[in-house]
């Protein structure tokens, strides 16, 4: 199997470590790094491993050229056996993730992953019972499917319109944390709840303050 790492930032480097550990062949592409800006025919690769910071339009173009585009979350969901708790929201997700991580480490063991912590691929099966993952709208938008055990949705305000295009698409990316769940949690704000929350089949646990 041959892979192309598309984007060589923090996540791209974690892809590199993951593939090296698996002893798999790969190339790296990053338009902003001269060492890695060689153009490739994407069709020749078995899989394209995309970083979350790739612009939405470019990501859609990549998927048209190769139908096996994966994110680090897709691989983590497949390979890791810990109980996975995802946290997203416009504000306070880092704070929430940090305090949950501290709490879980008092009574058990926990990874702190995502934007606030380590790359998810660096923590696959490292003997921690829980993985607390801070998730951005970029990550949620690009992941294939939601394999979290629990999802926590905090507040949603207008943000990242340069990536998503409009507020509705931004909300849809956040909605993905609530799909395919046994249990979810969200911040109770009577002025900003969305109709789609009431349609979720998962168990809903409401709260007003952290």
Regions found by a protein language model. Give the residues of each.
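Flexible active-site lid/hinge loop adjacent to a nucleotide/diphosphate
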Residues: 127-210
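Conserved substrate/cofactor phosphate-moiety recognition/catalytic segment
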Residues: 29-36, 105, 109-127
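Short glycine/serine/threonine-rich phosphate/pyrophosphate-binding segments
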Residues: 12-15, 93-99, 119, 135
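Conserved Rossmann-like nucleotide-cofactor binding loop
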Residues: 11, 34, 118, 138, ...
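Short loop/edge segments at beta-strand edges and connector loops
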Residues: 30, 35, 71-73, 113-117, ...
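Residue-level preference for the first positions of well-ordered beta-strands
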Residues: 2, 84, 109, 130-132
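Short, basic phosphate-binding NTP loop
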Residues: 1-86, 208
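Walker A (P-loop) phosphate-binding motif
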Residues: 72-116
């Amino acid at each position: 199997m041959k892979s192309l790492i598309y984007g060589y930032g923090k996540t791209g480097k974690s892809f590199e470590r993951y593939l090296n550990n698996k002893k798999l062949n790969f190339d790296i592409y990053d338009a902003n790094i001269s060492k890695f800006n060689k153009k490739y025919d994407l069709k020749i690769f078995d899989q394209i491993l995309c970083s979350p910071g790739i612009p939405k339009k470019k990501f859609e173009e990549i998927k048209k050229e190769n139908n096996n585009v994966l994110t680090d979350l897709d691989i983590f969901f497949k390979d890791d056996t810990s109980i996975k708790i995802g946290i997203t929201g416009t504000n306070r997700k880092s704070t929430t993730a940090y305090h949950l991580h501290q709490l879980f480490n008092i009574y058990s063991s926990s990874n702190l992953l995502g934007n606030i912590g380590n790359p998810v691929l660096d923590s696959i099966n490292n003997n921690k019972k829980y993985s607390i993952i801070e998730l951005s709208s970029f990550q949620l938008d690009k992941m294939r499917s939601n394999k979290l055990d629990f999802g926590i949705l905090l507040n949603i305000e207008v943000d990242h319109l340069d990536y998503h295009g409009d507020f509705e698409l931004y909300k849809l990316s956040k909605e993905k944390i609530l799909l395919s769940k046994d249990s979810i949690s969200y911040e109770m704000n009577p002025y900003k709840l969305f109709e789609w929350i009431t349609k979720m089949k998962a168990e809903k646990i409401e709260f007003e303050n952290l």
